[in-house]
Each structure stands twice: as C-alpha cells, then as structure tokens.
C-alpha cells in the first residue's frame, strides 16, 4: 500500500496548492454558506407567512421524503461539513503537529531500517535523523555530528547554505487512516460518515432537479437533466462512502 499512501498525499497536495482548485474551493465554501443561510431564512419566511398549519394536509401524497425534509437534511449536512473540516481540512492547513510522510528503507550494511522523509520530487528522500525539525536547535558539540538539513514547514533547507533544496508531503493519508481506524471512535466515525453520505444523496436527489425548476428550465432536456441529477446524487456520495468503509473494514 506504499504507492497508495503516496498517491493519496500527492492528490492532497494538488488539491491544496493548485490555483484553479483553490479558487473553485473558495467559491464552493461561499456557495455552501449562502445556500445554508438562504435556506434558513426561507424556512423562517414560510413559517411567518403561515404560522398555523393547514387543517387537512397529506404531504406524503404531494411530495417526496427529501423535499419534505430539506431543512433537516441540509442541517445534518452542514454539521457533517463542519466536522469534516475540523478533522481534516483544518489539520491539513493549520496544525503545526501535522505529520509528514515518511518511508522506512533498509540501507546496505545496516541491520535496522531507517526512516526517510518523502520529497515531492521524484527520487527525493531525506533521512529523518539527519534533519532538524521545524524550530529545533542542533546542540551537537562536534561539527561533524551536526545535521545538514532542516525543515521549515514542509520546505527542506540546507543548514549551511540556508537554501531551499526541496519539499516534503504532509501525511493526510495517515491522519485519515488513523481517524477511521481509531480503536475507540473509528467505527462511529465510519458509520457517521456513511450516514452523512446517505443524507447527502437524499438532499442532492431532490435539490439538483428542483434547482433547474426554480430557474425555469423546462424543455426537451428536462428528462436528461433529471437523470443526470439522480445519477450524480447516487454515484458521488456512494464513492465517498466507500472510502471510510474500505479503511475501517478492509485496509490492513
């Protein structure tokens, strides 16, 4: 799984540094906040417009489960997003103790394997015990024993020349696996994530097509739009739900 480990971290690095992705991410954040606030205000407006319920009503006959419970489903999704951001996004961006990706290699003539930081460029490896951690001071009295490399965040510098020589990966893979495999909360985190994806599927199932209806799109493409919306509402949450299930129950 070493290759999967690195591929996951390569993907995470791309998603957090690519300018186009970052712009789309911020647009998405703003859109979600606007959608949440707008939905909340619309719910309040509807309650004020009709504080007393209809004397006779049969909602099940007029609408589906998702459309009748959009506010509840939306609230659950918002709670999930906040939880997800705290456990993964915030750690990736702001946690000073975020682990860096390492790999163990047994060198010729060495009885025990050594840990190496994995560089973002092909073939870049830095022996962990020869690198100063971010903020660490080298107290070695013998100049020959002093470490030649130091970390500043994820950037690797040559100590003597004070020149950046490369970068290493933040280990989001480890954070993710540890979270879903945690002996105490792993099963609850896994089931909670899957439940959130189930809720998201319901929300998207109704929301995708209702959004086009609200925009007045009603033509020969309407059946296709509805089909695409339903496929999207099922496939995307399903693929995301598979990740924690695989990590918790299959990954060794």
Locate the predicted segments by residue:
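Membrane-embedded alpha-helical bundles that constitute the cytochrome b-like, heme-associated redox core
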Residues: 1-252
